UniProtKB/Swiss-Prot annotation:
Keyword set, alphabetical order: Antiport, Cell membrane, Membrane, Transmembrane, Transmembrane helix, Transport
Family per similarity comment: Belongs to the multi antimicrobial extrusion (MATE) (TC 2.A.66.1) family.
PANTHER family linked to this entry: MULTIDRUG RESISTANCE PROTEIN
Phylogenetic placement of the source organism: Eukaryota, Metazoa, Chordata, Craniata, Vertebrata
GO cellular component: apical plasma membrane; plasma membrane
Gene responsible for this protein: SLC47A2
GO biological process, one term: xenobiotic detoxification by transmembrane export across the plasma membrane
Protein name as annotated: Multidrug and toxin extrusion protein 2
Topological region Cytoplasmic: 1-33, 88-119, 175-183, 234-253, 339-346, 402-420, 466-557
Catalytic activity: thiamine(out) + H(+)(in) = thiamine(in) + H(+)(out); estrone 3-sulfate(in) + H(+)(out) = estrone 3-sulfate(out) + H(+)(in); creatinine(in) + H(+)(out) = creatinine(out) + H(+)(in)
Length: 581
């Protein structure tokens, strides 16, 4: 296991020796490299979340019920759809960055294809829940009128789910190659379309919440199509795309071994905040509206892993952009077996976000009385927001640090640890404490955020301790597997073993009591074949890496499609039966 001193040379100079011991050598250069990478990603995330902010602003000025409906609709879509897809696709952060840093760059295209297939399958069970939005919300004692409007929004949003998944996947495909500006351009296009669509559908045609949902769908399609066309027309795929390959149907096991922990790492945290929204809905429309406004404030200041409104409470733009940048830099360095650079990127990213989050947290506290006016005219909501924002400003500092550590974990392929930490801190500590303070102590929305503050503080401590003891050399070895380098080597050895002779050399060798026996030996420049190897040994050496046959692929992938389709049919059946009663 490599210590900080073993892996990253430290700069002991300067006027503050104690501080310099924490700063790796080359910190300044690495910090600017991270900012150059994360800067466009920051803009991209701002533009992406602006779509939801604009929609919320339009609906917020329609009334409390409309604002609450949009908030719940987006929360429901997040919990039951976007969070799952974004979590599973986060495996691509590990696989794509490490593959692009390795000599096997074409493997990035295979990962893109594999990820697209997996995410499309995920849409089917998510849609099953979307069909029953109103009934689920009523089970949680949500307001009937709010639940009805929420169902309208979610039903309209159904075709937008695979579009969001594809857009997220294309963005990861580019950013893990250090290509960032096309995402910004697509975000500009999406926001322009969204602004015009919201004005036309909500303000002019008076379609209300339904108009906002239609505007959201239109803008999602516009920016996704633009990004896809940009990649093709500018030929950004040439270095990593070798065409459609049946290999994307192989190796789903290793993909899910990263995808499931990635999903849990994100979703257990994401769901905790969405549960907070549902809890606020149990209190009053004012508390729920205040929660929505705080989420939006968080969107502008923090922004984390995904593309949706309600996730904004624990997401802040700059930390998210820096987290992605750290993930890319760490993953590419490990793919190239450069552990020194990988750890330098990790340490530099964490130190940078500490300073940035302190500045942002201070600004939030200073502007606590002004921020609420941006999103609503309701004085009760504005007053409640101003009370909670000081707590959120402290929360933001620790959550921002956790966000960047999440990038380190994704870059190293250690999402399983992140999932475990989030599950414990949010569901065993944070949420129970928040519920206790909210409903028993009667602190209402303030109690929820105090519970979340305790949660992120403990999570930060766990991430710091874990990464300080991380074995970076082992992580580099694992990166070889993720990037397909070991499989390539094994296939090359297998092919060399099975190939015919490159040339024959006749020689006389003495074999025991029979001197002068002439044997023909075969040799290749890259390997030497032992003619005396037993059949079992030869089979062991020449056996290719585990690949499924065509029959096995049809059975297994067909079973996956059948299971996903069956889930959708169950959801449709439940909706029909529930509607009749």
């Amino acid at each position: 296991m490599d210590s900080l001193q073993d892996t990253v040379p430290l700069d002991h100079g300067g006027c503050c020796p104690a501080l310099s011991r924490l700063v790796p050598r080359g910190f300044g250069t690495e910090m600017w490299t991270l900012f150059a990478l994360s800067g466009p990603l920051f803009l991209f995330q701002v533009l992406t979340f602006m779509i939801y902010i604009v929609s919320t602003v339009f609906c917020g000025h329609l009334g409390k019920v409309e604002l609450a409906s949009v908030t719940l609709a987006v929360a429901f879509v997040n919990v039951c759809g976007v969070s799952v897809g974004v979590g599973l696709s986060s495996a691509c952060d590990t696989l794509m960055s490490q593959s692009f840093g390795s000599p096997n760059k074409k493997h990035v295209g295979v990962i893109l294809q594999r990820g697209a297939l997996v995410l499309l399958l995920c849409c089917l069970p998510c849609w099953a829940l979307f069909l029953n939005t109103q009934h689920i919300l009523l089970l949680f004692r949500q307001d009937p009128e709010v639940s009805r409007l929420t169902q309208d929004y979610v039903m309209i949003f159904i075709p937008g789910l695979p579009v969001i998944f594809l857009y997220n996947l294309l963005a990861k495909y580019l950013q893990n190659q250090k290509i960032t500006w096309p995402q910004v351009l697509s975000g500009v296009v999406g926001n322009c379309v969204n602004g015009v669509a919201n004005y036309a559908l909500v303000s002019v045609l008076n379609l209300g919440v339904r108009g906002s949902a239609y505007a959201n769908i239109i803008s999602q399609f516009a920016q996704t199509v633009f990004l896809l066309l940009y990649i093709v027309l500018k030929k950004l795929h040439l270095e990593t795309w070798a065409g459609w390959s049946s290999q994307c149907l192989q190796d789903w096991g290793p993909f899910f071994s990263l995808a499931v922990p990635s999903m849990l790492m994100i979703c257990v945290e994401w769901w905790a905040y969405e549960i907070g929204s549902f809890l606020m809905g149990l209190l009053s429309v004012v508390d729920l509206s205040a929660q929505a406004v705080i989420y939006e404030v968080a969107t502008v200041t923090y922004m984390r892993h995904s593309h949706h409104l309600a996730y904004t409470a624990h997401v802040a733009r700059i930390p998210l952009g820096l987290s992605i940048g750290v993930c890319v830099r760490v993953g590419m360095a490990l793919g190239a077996a450069d552990t020194v650079q990988a750890k330098r990127s990790a340490v530099s990213g964490v130190l940078s976000i500490v300073g940035i989050s302190l500045v942002l947290g201070t600004l939030i506290s200073i502007l606590k009385n002004q921020l609420g006016h941006i999103f609503t005219n309701d004085e009760d909501v504005i007053a409640l927001v101003s009370q909670v924002l000081p707590v959120y400003s402290v929360f933001h500092v620790f959550e921002a640090i956790c966000c960047v550590y999440g990038g380190v974990l994704r870059g190293t392929g250690k999402q399983a640890f992140g999932a475990a930490v989030n599950a414990i801190t949010y569901y065993i500590i944070g949420l129970p404490l928040g519920i206790l303070l909210t409903f028993v102590v009667r602190m209402r929305i303030m109690g929820l955020w105090l519970g979340m503050l305790a949660c992120v503080f403990l999570a930060t401590a766990a991430f710091v301790a874990y990464t300080a003891r991380l074995d970076w050399k082992l992580a580099a070895e694992e990166a070889k597997k993720h990037s397909g380098q070991q499989q390539q080597q094994q296939r090359a050895e297998s092919t060399a073993t099975r190939s015919g002779p490159e040339k024959a050399v006749l020689s006389s060798v003495a074999t025991g009591s029979s001197p002068g026996i002439t044997l023909t030996t075969y040799s290749r420049s890259e390997c030497h074949v032992d003619l005396f190897r037993t059949p079992e040994e030869a089979h062991t050496l020449s056996a290719p890496t585990s690949r499924l046959s065509v029959k096995q692929l049809v059975i297994r992938r067909g079973a996956a499609l059948g299971a996903a389709s069956a889930t959708l049919m169950v959801g449709l059946t439940v909706r029909i039966l529930a509607t009749r009663h």
